[in-house]
Amino acid sequence: MRLPASLRELGTAHRGAIELAHATLTIALSWAAVHTIFALHCAHDYYRGAKPGGLQFPSGDTHDHADYWDFVYFSFVIGMTAQVSDVGITDKTIRRTATAHGIISFIYNTALLALMINIAASAIAS
């Protein structure tokens, strides 16, 4: 419920620096929360079976199993680019999760871009 309230606050004509900072911080933290939740979800899928797997990290890795930073990297790359980079997906469940994450990220990033353009246009017009 905080994000719609923050977006509504950005749309008002008389907004101060505190309100603008609050709305911007809320949007940034909600963006990060989405990708952190997907990172935890991918970690759960990776370690759910008797033998961990489902993601193939680059061959230069020195550790045997992925840690949370690996999943954060994987998730935030999807969140920023709506695609995977150097991590191979070898499990159907994780592939479906990554597909949903990519679609949600694309929609979210498009909405944020539109919002920022609207804010910039209204600031220039004022």
Language-model features, listed with the residues they occupy:
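Membrane-proximal soluble regions of multi-pass membrane proteins
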Residues: 44-91
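Long, highly hydrophobic alpha-helical transmembrane signal-anchor segments
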Residues: 1-39
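General secondary-structure edge motif
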Residues: 13, 17, 79-87, 100
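Broad hydrophobic/π-residue packing in well-ordered secondary structure
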Residues: 31, 36-48, 55-57, 71, ...
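Pore domain of cation channels
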Residues: 70, 74-77, 89-125
